[in-house]
Curated annotation (Swiss-Prot):
GO molecular function terms listed in the Swiss-Prot or TrEMBL record: uroporphyrinogen decarboxylase activity
UniProt keywords, alphabetically: Cytoplasm, Decarboxylase, Lyase, Porphyrin biosynthesis
Site description Transition state stabilizer, residues in chain: 77
UniProt subcellular location: Cytoplasm
A Pfam family that the UniProt record links to this protein: URO-D
EC number assigned by the record: 4.1.1.37
Group of enzyme by EC: lyase
Species this protein is from: Shewanella amazonensis (strain ATCC BAA-1098 / SB2B)
Stored HAMAP family: URO_D
Subcellular location, principal: cytoplasm
Protein name per UniProt: Uroporphyrinogen decarboxylase
InterPro entries per the UniProt record, alphabetical: UROD/MetE-like_sf, Uroporphyrinogen_deCO2ase_HemE, Uroporphyrinogen_deCOase
Length: 354
């Protein structure tokens, strides 16, 4: 593998000194870029794009050609694991992801296999190794998975949900069935992320998109407990370097201390959290990633620059901050505004790293 030329993202996650604050964007390979839309059209549909290693590599690299980003993230989807378990993932126009079959009974959950990442999910591993090779050491590659709780919401509901009625009914009336599902998912995620690391991912992130829908005690029992199991099971060193792990619960500002106790290296913050407060609470234990409101990219460029300065000042001096949005970039954002955001982070952060 080529030697890494820009490692400031990995260094910041491990709280080692950096020259400027590193920056990348969730969904940086996405529909806001015309070149992405062209490649997706060429692929035919979203999952065909994910399953073609060359095209997945192409869209991963597209934002790096435009912007001075400090990391690349694997182009894939969080629902690859449930799809590989045989639930039949498909996408409805305007409806988002759906499954042909649900995992909404104890019998259905018991029947679920744990997928082999090199077999049923081999297309993801081919994408990881292709991207890592084509990056030529320019920046590190981030691998990722959904959290067990978040994956389970789609599997029990049969797709996206606003109220989570079916899974919450299971959680409160059949908790053992849900724990069995979450345990299988945690085992699957460990295998999946370790395979990504073996194929070239230099850092991994767990997206707990729907953890914020849980009550205080339910979050610990049904989400955090299983992310803890994953952190404990991950390969933490590869290519002679530590492989940092980031946990991100959207709406998880209440639980930063508990998340920091898992042994992860960094916490993702959404835009509802004050980063200065987050650093006071957990900055001695973990690095922080975030946390500009993605909608700020609709603002005039001077306003974006002002917001970047405010977040940098909120975090303050020293390392341990990876700048990002508080969630994925929106599809209608002007690519020039994204570029101005990335440039502002590098230019305005230098004074905090003397």
């Amino acid at each position: 593998m080529a030697e890494l030329k820009n490692d400031r993202y990995l260094r910041a996650l491990l709280k080692q000194p950096v020259d400027v604050t590193p920056v990348w964007m969730m969904r940086q390979a996405g529909r806001y870029l015309p070149e992405y839309r062209a490649t997706r059209a060429q692929a035919g549909d979203f999952m065909s794009l994910c399953k073609n290693a060359e095209l997945a590599c192409e869209v991963t690299l597209q934002p790096l050609r435009r912007y001075e980003l400090d990391a690349a993230i694997l182009f894939s989807d969080i629902l690859t694991i449930p799809d590989a378990m045989g639930l039949g993932l498909y996408f409805e126009a305007g409806e988002g992801p759906r499954f042909e079959r649900k995992a909404d009974t104890l019998e259905a959950i018991k029947a679920l296999p744990i997928p082999d990442p090199e077999d049923e999910l081999g297309y993801v591993m081919r994408a990881v190794s292709t991207i890592r090779r084509e990056l030529k050491g320019e920046v590190p590659l981030i691998g990722f998975s959904g959290s067990p709780w978040t994956l389970a919401t789609y599997m029990v509901e049969g797709g996206s949900s606003k109220a989570f009625e079916k899974i919450k009914r299971m959680m409160y009336s059949e908790p053992m069935a849900l724990h069995l599902l979450l345990d299988k998912l945690a085992d699957s995620v460990i295998l999946y992320l370790n395979a990504q690391i073996a194929n070239g991912a230099q850092s991994v992130m767990i997206f707990d998109s729907w953890g914020g829908a849980l009550s205080h005690s339910a979050y610990r029992e049904f989400s955090l407990r299983y992310m803890q199991k994953i952190v404990d099971g991950l390969t933490r060193e590869a290519d002679g370097r530590k492989v940092p792990v980031t946990l991100f619960t959207k709406g998880g500002g209440l639980w930063l201390e508990s998340m920091a106790e898992t042994g992860c290296d960094a916490l993702g913050l959404d835009w509802t959290v004050d980063i200065a407060d987050a650093r006071r609470r957990v900055g001695h234990k973990v690095a922080l990633q975030g946390n500009m409101d993605p909608s700020m990219l609709y603002a005039p460029i001077p306003r974006i620059e002002e917001e970047v300065e405010q977040i940098l000042a909120g975090f303050g001096e020293g390392t341990g901050h990876v700048f990002n949005l508080g969630h994925g970039i929106h599809q209608h954002v002007d690519p020039e505004h994204a570029g101005a955001f990335i440039k502002a982070v590098h230019e305005k952060s230098r004074k905090y790293h003397k």
